[in-house]
Amino acid sequence: GLKINIKQITIPVFYSLIPFTLITLIIMMTAPKIGAFEENLLVNGLNQADSKMQITRTQADNVSASQYNVAKGTTVIGDSVALRASEWLKQAMPEIQVDAAVSRNLESGLQVYQTDISNKVLLETVVLALGTNTVDNYESLLNQFIEKLPKGHRLVLVTPYDGRTAHNASSLAVKTRQYELELAKKYDYVFVADWYQTAIEHPEIWYGTDYVHFGSETTTITKGGELYAQTVKQTIDEATK
C-alpha cells in the first residue's frame, strides 16, 4: 500500500508558514499605537455598546412599572464629548443612561430623541449634550426638542465648547450656547449645564488637545471627565430640588 512519510508533509508546511509569521510580526511592530484620546473613545464606545442590553432592559422595566407616570432617572443624548465623559457621568450618577456617538449633532440627535419618545423610554430628566458639531439651523432644532418634550419631563442643555472659536461671538458654537441660555430663561423646565463656562475656567485640561475633546493624557482626561460630570450633575441636582 501507499506509505505516507509524515516528515515529508510537516517540513514543507512548517517552511510555508514562515513568511506568514514574518508578515504578522512586521504588522504588529509597525502598526501605529493609539494615543490616550483614541484609546479613551474606543474604551468608552465599547463600554457603551456593552451596556446597551442592560439599558434596554431597564427602560422596558421602567415603562411597564409606570404605565402613566414618568420614570425617574436621566437620559443623556450626546456627542463624542459626552462619550468621552461617559465613564465619569456614570460614576457621578450611577443610574444615568448615556447614548452618545461620535459626530452626532443636533439634527441626528433629534432623530434619537424622537425614537426614544416613540418607544416611551425617555427618563424624567433629558440631557442634550450636543452642539459641538455645529449646524446652521440650531434655533429651529432646539425649538423642536422643546416642542416635542413629553409632559412631566425636564430638559438640560449642555452648552458646547470649541476652544478654537470660544471667544468668537459669531461662531456657531457660541451662538448655539447663547440661544440655549435664552431658552432656559424662557421655559421653567429647561436648564443649562454650562460646560462652555467650565471649560473656559480650566485651561489645564486643554493642553495638547484639539480644544474640543478634553485631555491629552490620563490625568487631564480624568480631570476633564470629572469636571464635565460635575457640571451636569450640579444642574440636575438644582433642577430636581
Regions found by a protein language model. Name each.
Residues 151-155:
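A short helix->loop->beta-strand "cap" motif at the edges of active sites that frequently abuts
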Residues 75-77, 156, 191-193:
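Hydrophobic/aromatic beta-strand patches that form the interior of the parallel beta-sheet core
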Residues 159-160, 176:
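Extracytosolic low-complexity repeat regions of secreted or lipid-anchored proteins
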Residues 129, 158-159:
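Alpha/beta-hydrolase-fold catalytic nucleophile elbow
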Residues 60-144, 164-167, 171-174:
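Conserved SGNH/GDSL esterase-like catalytic core that processes O-acyl groups on lipids
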Residues 99-101, 158, 193-198:
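Conserved beta-strand termini and adjacent loop/short-helix elements that scaffold enzyme active sites
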